[in-house]
Amino acid sequence: GQGSLAYPGLRTQGNLETLSGPNDATRGLTSLADTFEHVIEELLDEQQVIQPSKENKDADLYSTRVMLSSQVPLEPPLLFLLEEYKNYLDAANMSMRVRRHSDPARRGELSVCDSTSEWVTAAEKKTAVDMSGATVTVLEKVPVPKGQLKQYFYETKCSSKGYAKEGCRGIDKRYWNSQCRTTQSFVRALTMDNKKRVG
C-alpha cells in the first residue's frame, strides 16, 4: 500500500495486515526488512542535515555514548548503533541492493583490533579534562525530582586478549610494527569544576 507518515521524515512502506497468502507473507517480511533499512537511512540522512558547521562548533559535542538512568542500560545506545551502521555503509561504499547482502559476518571479516564495549559510571573515572584543558569532576549521580539517576558512559577499549599485544591484523609484521591502543575522546557529560559549577 501507500506509505503513511509514522514519524516526521520517516515513511513506512508496508505492514503485515495487508497480506493474504503465504507468498505474500514472504514478500511482506522482505518489505518490512526493506522498510527497516529505509528508516535507518532516513534517520542517518536527518543527522547529516544537522551536522555542525564551522560557526556551530558546539554541536560537535553531541554524544551518543552518555546516558542518565536508574540502572545499567541493557543495550548499546541506539544512536551509537546507527552511527556504527552508517560508518560501515560509508566504508563499503556500495549500492542499496548490494548492502542488503553484505553483512560483514557473512564474509568472515574481522576487525583490525579486537575491542570490548560496556557501560561504566564515574565510579571508575572520577575526573576528566574538559575542552579548555581544565580538570573537572565527573558527576556519578544526578539529582532529579524523584531521586537520583546515574550517569553512564558507553566505553569502548582494546580487548586484553587477542591481537592487542601482537599487533594489528592485516599488517605485515616482517616490515611494519603496529599496536592497538585505546584513545580518548570528548563527550558531552555532566561535570563540576573547581568552583562547584555544574555543567
From Swiss-Prot:
Compositional bias (Polar residues): 12-23
PANTHER family per UniProt: BRAIN-DERIVED NEUROTROPHIC FACTOR, NERVE GROWTH FACTOR NGF -RELATED
Native organism: Eunectes notaeus
Name of the featured protein: Neurotrophic factor BDNF precursor form
Keyword Disulfide bond: yes
UniProt xrefs under Gene3D superfamilies: Cystine-knot cytokines
GO molecular-function terms, A-Z: growth factor activity; nerve growth factor receptor binding
Glycan-linked positions: N93
Region feature Disordered, mapped onto this chain: 1-23
Locations listed in the record: Secreted
Stated family: Belongs to the NGF-beta family.
GO BP: cell surface receptor protein tyrosine kinase signaling pathway; modulation of chemical synaptic transmission; negative regulation of neuron apoptotic process; nerve development; nerve growth factor signaling pathway; neuron projection morphogenesis
Taxonomic lineage from the root: Eukaryota, Metazoa, Chordata, Craniata, Vertebrata
Signal peptide stretch: none
Gene: BDNF
Disulfide links within the chain: C113-C180
A cellular-component GO term for this protein: synaptic vesicle
Keyword Disulfide bond: yes
Alphabetical keyword list: Cleavage on pair of basic residues, Disulfide bond, Glycoprotein, Growth factor, Secreted
